Design a protein with these regions (language model features):
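Hydrophobic beta-strand segments
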Residues: 53-58
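Short, acidic Ser/Thr/Gly-rich low-complexity loop/linker segments typical of extracellular
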Residues: 61-76
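Structural motif
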Residues: 25-52
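Short Pro-Gly-centered beta-turn/loop motif in secreted/extracellular proteins
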Residues: 78-88, 94
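Feature of secretome-associated and extracellular-like proteins
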Residues: 21-25, 100-101, 107-189
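Solvent-exposed strand-loop boundary residues in beta-sheet-rich modules
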Residues: 45, 59-63, 95-97
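Bacterial Sec-dependent N-terminal signal peptides
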Residues: 1-31
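A short, solvent-exposed loop/turn motif at the edges and junctions
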Residues: 90-106
């Protein structure tokens, strides 16, 4: 066996071992009933700047089990989510504010699973200013759920708006405080 073949076989074994460590609910469902989530982690102000980071995926409803994995060096992430559960995904990168998304895989018709369910996400992160209160970024800022009329996963705008508004207020406050234009604990109007 030459060196090239050895490296190829070793690489395949490592990939299989890493895949085997994932919980079942992150692997493709054996009967095709899983949503495939793929996306890119980017800087919010410069979306051409991709970020290497970390994703923490939690099966909130069924086992409360979490799995942490890294994005690629080019910010790419991919995972599967099985039917009939609620999941949260936390996205982070050094020096940036962690953001969360909720995925609800309940109420997806069997016909939709047969066609395949894909969710594409461009996750934009903000640089974390000094004094930013992390508490406002704990709640998921978006919630994806299957829309029967549109026949695809969409995010719930009503659920999202209030969380985003509070996040944006705190981000503006922390940035202004960092620049010295307002008192650190004063809310921004």
């Amino acid at each position: 066996m030459n060196k090239k073949s050895f490296i190829l076989i070793l690489s395949m074994l490592v990939i299989n071992m890493l895949h085997a460590q994932k919980p079942d609910w992150m692997k493709p469902h054996p009967e095709g009933r899983s949503a495939f989530v793929q996306g890119l982690l980017v800087d919010r102000e410069d979306s051409l700047k991709v970020l290497a980071g970390e994703v923490v995926l939690t099966n909130v409803e069924n086992s409360n089990e979490s799995y942490t994995f890294s994005t690629t060096s080019t910010g790419v992430f991919q995972f599967h989510l099985w039917e009939n559960s609620i999941y949260t995904a936390s996205f982070s990168s050094n020096g940036y504010i962690t953001r969360r998304i909720e995925f609800n895989t309940h109420d997806v018709p069997a016909k939709a699973w047969k066609k395949g369910c894909d969710i594409d996400v461009k996750m934009s992160l903000d640089i974390k200013p000094n004094g930013f209160k992390e508490l406002v970024s704990v709640l998921p800022f978006a919630s994806f759920k299957y829309d029967l009329d549109e026949r695809l996963f969409l995010f719930d705008v009503t659920k999202t708006d209030a969380v985003i508004e509070r996040y944006e207020q705190e981000l503006a406050r922390a940035r202004a405080a960092e620049k010295g234009t307002v008192e650190p604990n004063q809310p921004q109007d």
